[in-house]
């Protein structure tokens, strides 16, 4: 019922407020702007001298029923919903509605959370899935939501990977460490032929989204025979040619300008204490089926050791 009727109300309000080309959802952007005249500032709430909102005031959109505001906000994003909560007390209340956060949750969310845990609201549940990854598929995958967008993220445990000689205890061992989200992860003991491959269904990821894939790891004793070598990695759709690049697990040993080091991706430190190196990017279209990846170093005759692999992570690519 609120659709076209309240769209015209929003249009008349924004015209009166002298905003040009305001679309229905643009009220969520008001609090981001610092260049408002005094009239707009008084409409949008309380500001300090820097021009940013410190507490919600009133908004011309407060004439709308709260459930209609909630319905409109549910068609935006979690980030925009949080911004909208700063517009006014009415918006703050509307944003807290379960109908808003239900739209941001994955359809199967009930199967992802423990039945023994009770959440006060869908908003609380949403942020729980952002901050506390849950194990799925017999504990071999980890699932969570990107906080700003609600896009799906997953990590495949090293148990889900195909590792050459991975079942041979003289070459690899499976360990449990408290800082891992998985029960067992792979530790490289000693190999010449270092090869890891894997694939996963793209359907567990959000469609219409560009993703980046990362290998998540730790090193021991400077990762002898491997840490300073460029390692070839590949990523792509099954049945198509994969994109190739090179990564380091530590970095080049000689920093005096070897040509090949300029095009090799160096690892980054993560907030959770692990390291990660990017394997590549892909766009997850509606028709995407499976994504495959590889991490290989078989050119050097050196014996390789000192690498602990937690898994392969897929998350939305950050905008540059």
Swiss-Prot record:
Coiled coil: none annotated. One of its GO terms (biological process) is embryo development ending in seed dormancy. Residues 58-104 form the F-box domain. SUPFAM superfamilies: F-box domain. InterPro entries: F-box-like_dom_sf, F-box_dom, PP2-like. Pfam families: F-box, PP2. This is F-box protein At2g02240. It comes from Arabidopsis thaliana.
């Amino acid at each position: 019922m609120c659709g076209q009727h309240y769209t015209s109300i929003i249009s008349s309000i924004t015209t009166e407020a002298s905003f040009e080309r305001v679309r229905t959802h643009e009220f969520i952007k008001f609090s981001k702007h610092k260049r408002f005249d005094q009239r707009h500032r008084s409409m949008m709430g309380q500001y300090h001298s820097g021009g940013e909102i410190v507490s919600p005031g009133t908004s011309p959109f407060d004439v709308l029923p709260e459930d209609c505001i909630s319905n409109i906000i549910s068609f935006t994003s979690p980030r925009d919903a949080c911004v909208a909560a700063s517009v006014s007390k009415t918006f703050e209340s509307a944003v807290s509605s379960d109908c808003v956060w239900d739209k941001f949750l994955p359809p199967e969310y009930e199967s992802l959370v423990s039945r023994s845990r009770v959440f006060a609201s869908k908003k609380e549940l949403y942020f729980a899935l952002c901050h506390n990854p849950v194990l799925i598929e017999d504990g071999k995958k980890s699932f969570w939501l990107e906080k700003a967008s609600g896009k799906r993220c997953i990590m495949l445990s090293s148990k889900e990977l195909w590792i050459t000689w991975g079942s041979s205890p003289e070459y690899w061992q499976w360990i449990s460490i408290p800082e891992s989200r998985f029960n067992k992860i792979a530790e490289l003991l000693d190999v010449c032929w270092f090869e890891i491959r894997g694939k996963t269904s793209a359907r567990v990821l959000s469609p219409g989204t560009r993703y980046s894939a990362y290998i998540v790891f730790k090193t021991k004793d400077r990762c002898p025979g491997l840490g300073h070598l460029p390692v070839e990695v590949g990523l792509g759709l099954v049945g198509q040619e994969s994109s190739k690049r090179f990564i380091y697990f530590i970095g080049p040993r000689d920093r005096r300008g070897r040509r090949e080091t300029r095009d090799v991706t160096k690892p980054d430190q993560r907030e959770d204490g692990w390291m990660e190196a990017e394997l590549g990017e892909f766009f997850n279209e509606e028709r995407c089926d499976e994504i495959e990846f590889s991490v290989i170093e078989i050119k050097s005759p050196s014996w390789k050791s000192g690498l602990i692999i937690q898994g392969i992570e897929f998350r939305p690519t950050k905008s540059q």
